[in-house]
């Protein structure tokens, strides 16, 4: 998996899917319906990510976390954390063996947006997208 930074304010879903699929950000954005618009305006839902990963041959499923807390989350899972002061629109991160891949580690700075690894999840997981074996 490559470390990929998001290129738009709401592009964390694209960056996480790109990292998981080992594709570039721009290449992955083409698989999203209205990707160039949604990355600037509304963001993406879990089903959007699942559909894109299925298109590139990675079978996944998404499910919600009913209670607060971060149960055992498998490696190569994309997690959505709910709205919080740091991420007012919520945020997607990818779990790897190196820690959590955060496609906008230096939020709120935008020039440039930097991706990086962090040891802990910044907030509680609300949704998980994981690979089906």
Predicted regions and their residues:
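Active-site nucleophile-adjacent alpha helix/oxyanion-hole segment immediately C-terminal to the catalytic cysteine
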Residues: 1-41, 46-51, 55-58, 133
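Conserved active-site-adjacent core of cysteine acyl-enzyme catalytic domains
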Residues: 32-124, 130
């Amino acid at each position: 998996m490559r470390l990929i930074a998001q290129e738009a304010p709401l592009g964390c879903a694209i960056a996480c899917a790109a990292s998981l699929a080992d594709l570039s950000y721009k290449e992955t954005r083409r698989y999203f319906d209205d990707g160039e618009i949604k990355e600037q305006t509304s963001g993406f839902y879990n089903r959007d990510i699942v559909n894109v990963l299925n298109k590139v041959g990675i079978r996944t499923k998404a499910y919600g976390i009913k209670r607060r807390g971060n149960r055992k989350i498998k490696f190569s899972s994309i997690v959505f954390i709910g709205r919080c002061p740091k991420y007012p629109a919520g945020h997607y991160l990818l779990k790897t063996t190196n820690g959590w891949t955060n496609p906008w580690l230096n939020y709120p700075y935008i020039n440039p947006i930097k991706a990086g690894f962090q040891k802990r999840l910044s907030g509680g997981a609300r949704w998980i997208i994981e690979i089906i074996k």
